[in-house]
Amino acid sequence: TEIARGNPLPSTLLLERVWNHRLQIAISRCNVLLQNVTLETPLIQAGGAYVSTEEKARWIAEAHFLRAFYYFDLMMIFANVPIIEESLNVIDKTTITKAPMEEVYDFIMKDLEVALAEENLPSAKELSADEFGRVTREAVYSFRARVALFNKDYALAKSDCKKVIDSGAYELIPNYEDLFNSVERGYMSKECIFMTYNSYNPPYCNGNPALIYFVGRGVTGGWGGEVPT
């Protein structure tokens, strides 16, 4: 209710969850990778083969993008936030201070520039089918355009959007309804630039596990009728 009234409080649980997830989990994981993985770091895959230098370079670029992605989300919600570039111990976490929005913006743009400078970051047309959902060059350009708009850098936003359009990797779906009713044409459509990829399991409440908590057992095998003692 505090958020709906435009008066969120520090005790608002939803905001606490967003803060913890973005800063303590997502950004922290990006920092762990950037701190510990270099092109020279020997890494072995599950099958026993070494991870190639090209793949490690791609991981690093993806981590820079994701860190920028989460920092922008934090900045839009909380304005001034602490800039953390490395893993922190318990003591360090108690002494960090917030940076002004201008510094956070510059930090975000720097991360995006690093990602775009990596030649091993592929374009959308270069992705294989099993890589759908990974960061692409067009995803970085699209996101940088969004960040630039919020900073009133309209020239950069226009330039980056044009790069995405000119890539030819995306197009509008003729039938708008297909975005919602067709897995093949909607979920993995040419309109999707960057998205979270989830498994689709029709028998499991048509792919939505939340339904089982709200419907009776006779409908979809849900748990809505369960009453714990």
In which residue ranges do the predicted regions lie?
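An aromatic- and glycine-enriched ligand-binding surface/loop that stacks and positions planar moieties
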Residues: 1, 81, 105, 109, ...
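Conserved, well-structured interaction surfaces
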Residues: 2-78, 99-103, 115-124
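A short small-residue
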Residues: 7-11, 88-93
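Active-site-proximal beta-strand/loop segments in catalytic clefts of secreted hydrolases
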Residues: 37, 86-87, 196-197
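Short linear capping/connector segments at secondary-structure termini
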Residues: 46-52, 85-92, 127-129
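All-alpha amphipathic helical-bundle segments outside canonical DNA-binding/catalytic cores
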Residues: 55, 59, 128-135
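Short coil/turn linking the two alpha-helices of tandem helical-hairpin repeats
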Residues: 75-77, 82-83, 88, 123, ...
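Flexible interdomain linker/hinge and immediately adjacent N-terminus
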Residues: 89-104
